[in-house]
Amino acid sequence: MSYAGNRDQQFNRSNFGGRDGDHRGQRPSDRNSYGRDGFGRGGRGGFAGRGRGRSDDRLELTKPDWDVESLPKFEKNFYVEHEDVQKMSTDEVEQFRKENEMKIVGHDVPKPIRTFDEAGFPEYVLKEVKEEGFEKPTAIQCQGWPMALSGRDMIGVAATGSGKTLSYCLPGIVHINAQPLLSPGDGPVVLVLAPTRELAVQIQKECSKFGRSSRIRNTCVYGGVPKSQQIRDLQRGVEILIATPGRLIDMLEIGKTNLKRVTYLVLDEADRMLDMGFEPQIRKIVDQIRPDRQTLMWSATWPKEVQQLARDYLHDPIQVNIGSLELAASHTITQLVEVVSDFDKRDRLVKHLEIASKDKDSKIIIFASTKRTCDEITSYLRQDGWPALAIHGDKQQQERDWVLNEFRTGRSPIMVATDVAARGIDVKGINFVINYDMPGNIEDYVHRIGRTGRAGATGTAISFFTEANKTLGAQLISIMREAKQEIPQDLLVYDRAPRGGFHPRYGGRGGRGGRGGRGGRGYGGYGGGYGGYGGGYGGGHGGYGGKPKDSGWGNRN
């Protein structure tokens, strides 16, 4: 079997080697080990009141009675239309939008720009962009930048990996530099809400990269780690705050920050935040922000729940949709679906890893439905000599960061993940996504495979479809047809509408996570059953890149 877009190299499982020995840096076995030692966080599954008692000194977050007229005035319209954009005729604008699959909603929408120079950014912003080596703006940036710089409330609907982060990050930097400097005790000027810590960290990296010339300070606030460093950052003062909703509410309730200075609010991956149950927290947070702020909402899909949130909190917004509003997969991704039994999955997985390993630079994400399965797959692969690491919600943040860094740098080019852990991960060069377990709904399928084929690159998504996934059959086939993918004959037997009660986007979610939180039980975990990395894997299997024999990635015989 071969995959479209591969580099015409022959099978060579040792291609993943050549990494000069054990690239774990002789780390002790507590890294990514599964003898939990008491730090598993079972029972904290809720987002809103995570099982902690409220202390008496916590503030009660109530909606202020805003008097907009008495609030300090602020500037939010910075857009100066470039002369080349001014010259664009109505027909030229319509043709450009058609070519880039843009659909516009609202009145007085600025014309799209076509180059970085046309965007109207100050020179200090433009310099940062050009130094990154980008050739031209993405479609969402071409229309999103003029909309955001004009100070209007706006909605951007575009697929994951389309460049949404820079669409709001760069205008946010311009916005900050036009506001008065922070005084002691002031909260941020720009607030970005994101569904997961991984996405929040990724956003922070972009803000740091493009805000350095202006010396704009930022911090990232999320759960799963101690509050102390986050509190210190907030108390020193930051212009940009990137946060997950739950931890931000914690910080507001204990008085470590406030949102009185926020005039630029971003809701990133709004559909994900609502899907994860964050709507009450979002509403509580937004109520703490002055109503005449500029609000930007970004989403990969446009379900009715997101539409309602936009109606409640955005004023006279303008909207750009890139591509179809129907759920769709990127056309740069080759989708391969195999109808298999659960018994066949492991053999099929190894076969695909052998194919992928002919490119020594490949990065592969394997999705599993539960934390336990995630651990079991990783254990199986590592025993077989594959350099795999796992990431899921039971892991401490320090451990997750280490795993991501090993994956990002290619030292461990296989990462086994659950949906929640992988949300927001933006790693360049992911060639393959393997759905070892199909997700519970079609939206998560599209989101998973969107880890590859980003920003115009090509990628391959392989999915193991079993009889247990039959309720997804019709929707999966529809997604594949829209992307002009070849549909296997044994999948076509599932091409029928799901039976009653199955919502086309959200049905079937109730079964997810049933076995979550059991990682390490019943099979000893890595640290217990197999002696940890330094013992069982480092000694018995040669670690990542060393022995057995001359193995690197996969020469395991």
Swiss-Prot record:
Q: Which domain of life is it from?
A: Eukaryota
| Location of the region described as Disordered in the Swiss-Prot/TrEMBL record | 1-58
Motif Q motif location, chain numbering: 114-142
What does the record say about domains?
Answer: The Q motif is unique to and characteristic of the DEAD box family of RNA helicases and controls ATP binding and hydrolysis.
GO process terms (BP): alternative mRNA splicing, via spliceosome; nuclear polyadenylation-dependent mRNA catabolic process; nuclear-transcribed mRNA catabolic process, nonsense-mediated decay; rRNA processing; termination of RNA polymerase II transcription
InterPro entries found in the cross-reference section: DEAD/DEAH_box_helicase_dom, Helicase_ATP-bd, Helicase_C-like, P-loop_NTPase, RNA-helicase_DEAD-box_CS, RNA_helicase_DEAD_Q_motif
Q: Where are the compositionally biased (Basic and acidic residues) regions?
A: 19-34
Provide the binding site for ATP.
Answer: 158-165
Instruction: Give the protein name, as stated in the record.
Output: ATP-dependent RNA helicase DBP2
Its taxonomic path starts at: Eukaryota, Fungi, Dikarya, Ascomycota, Saccharomycotina
RNA-binding RGG-box: annotated segments = 506-532
Any one Gene Ontology MF annotation carried by this entry is: snoRNA binding
Q: What does this protein do?
A: ATP-dependent RNA helicase involved nonsense-mediated mRNA decay and ribosome biogenesis through rRNA processing.
Q: Which residues form the Helicase C-terminal domain?
A: 348-495
Q: Which UniProt keywords apply?
A: ATP-binding, Cytoplasm, Helicase, Hydrolase, Nonsense-mediated mRNA decay, Nucleotide-binding, Nucleus, Ribosome biogenesis, RNA-binding, rRNA processing
